[in-house]
């Protein structure tokens, strides 16, 4: 896919989304996050089931340690299913603790930060990888962030295009 040719898809049908809120997100209901995730999935052409887990840093550390052998918490992890196995695109896990800290540093709401991390995770489930794609994921994330009315996205922050005035952000270690 050429970075300059990407446009959000117009896929309309509903796909199953599972939202698991182990922690309550201020200003964001389960239903609102489900609607947002569905819009983001449609925009990148995901027509398969997705699960989004909102949890704490302790569980994120355990997931990161178990699956990636990294013994620290992180803000978002994505676990794509191979080739959308059985109509399932994959899982996304988000740390509410780290999201809240980064939201304070970036001076936007925790609910916006959760949406940013959800979008980032969905892009990974769609097969994008900012570590190796020469900026394609960053461009798509920027376009979708603007389309969806979100503040600076993860890759923009990590690349230094927008810095926090309060110090370093905890970056995604996907």
Language model features with spans:
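An acidic/histidine-cluster motif and surrounding catalytic segment
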Residues: 2-114, 123-174
């Amino acid at each position: 896919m050429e970075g300059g040719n990407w446009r959000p898809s117009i896929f309309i049908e509903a796909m199953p989304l599972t939202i698991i809120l182990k922690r309550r997100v201020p200003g964001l209901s389960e239903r609102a996050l489900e609607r947002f995730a569905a819009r983001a999935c449609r925009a990148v052409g995901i027509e398969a089931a997705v699960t989004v887990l909102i949890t704490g840093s302790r569980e994120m550390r355990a997931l990161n340690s178990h699956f990636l052998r990294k013994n620290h918490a992180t803000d978002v992890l994505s676990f794509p299913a191979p080739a959308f196995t059985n109509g399932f695109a994959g899982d996304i896990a988000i740390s509410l603790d780290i999201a809240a800290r980064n939201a304070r540093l970036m001076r936007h709401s925790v609910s916006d930060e959760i949406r940013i991390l959800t979008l980032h995770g969905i892009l990974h489930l769609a097969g994008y990888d900012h570590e190796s794609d020469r900026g394609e994921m960053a461009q798509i994330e920027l376009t979708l962030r603007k389309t969806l009315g979100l503040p600076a996205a993860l890759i923009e922050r990590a690349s230094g295009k927008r810095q926090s005035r309060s110090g370093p952000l905890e970056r995604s270690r996907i």
